[in-house]
Amino acid sequence: MATLKANKRTDFKRSTLQKIRHSGHVPGVIYGKNTDNLAVSLDSIDLLKTLRDEGKNTIITLDVNGETKSVMVTELQTDPLKNELVHADFQVVDLQREIEADVPVQLIGESKGVKDGGVLQQPLFELSITAKPKDIPQHIEADITNLEVNDVLTVADLPVQSSYQVNNDPEEVVASILPPQQSEVPEPDSEEEPKEPEAIKEKDNDGE
């Protein structure tokens, strides 16, 4: 569990927010049940590095001027033109109470079906789970090694873990192997052009 330092914000002018961002920090807000919203700022690079290394559902200890809070990132706002972080939302979590979270699905292995020319499809990229904050995995692995052509891997096929509960429909498809795609080759035209009918000569019956 990472610990990041944050500073309390009391000035909400636009010019102040711009100064915060120009200094390499990102403004944010901490909120939660039975707690007042708290405006903060923290180093944007440290925050992004933590999320990249430990996953989006990691628990972060925010040290706000000496007072610590256990939080999760619930939203990140970015400027698409400048490609920079402009705001972050943090939710205070109770480490002893279960919460819902979306966790990425990571396919592992090379399926037999793909080796035989089949096409891998993955319609499900995240699983909804319920777990205590510290038990939320960075990702959930789905082994596709034994999948052959026309096989499917469903949520029910994933390994059962006691540390979290999966909320998705057990029959929901995680991955499947489609048959090889065959390109249709047009058959040559073997039909001969019809011959013109022969002209039929009529014999004149002129009394000769």
Curated annotation (Swiss-Prot):
SUPFAM superfamilies: Ribosomal protein L25-like. Residues 178-208 are annotated as: Disordered. Keywords: Ribonucleoprotein, Ribosomal protein, RNA-binding, rRNA-binding. Pfam families: Ribosomal_L25p (PF01386), Ribosomal_TL5_C (PF14693). InterPro entries: Rbsml_bL25/Gln-tRNA_synth_N, Ribosomal_bL25/Gln-tRNA_synth, Ribosomal_bL25_b-dom, Ribosomal_bL25_C, Ribosomal_bL25_long, Ribosomal_L25_dom, Ribosomal_uL5_bac-type. GO terms for molecular function: 5S rRNA binding; structural constituent of ribosome. Residues 186-195 have a biased composition (Acidic residues). One of its GO terms (cellular component) is cytosolic large ribosomal subunit. Residues 196-208 have a biased composition (Basic and acidic residues). Transmembrane segments: none annotated. GO terms for biological process: translation. This is one of the proteins that binds to the 5S RNA in the ribosome where it forms part of the central protuberance. Part of the 50S ribosomal subunit; part of the 5S rRNA/L5/L18/L25 subcomplex. Contacts the 5S rRNA. Binds to the 5S rRNA independently of L5 and L18. Belongs to the bacterial ribosomal protein bL25 family. CTC subfamily. This is Large ribosomal subunit protein bL25. The gene is rplY.
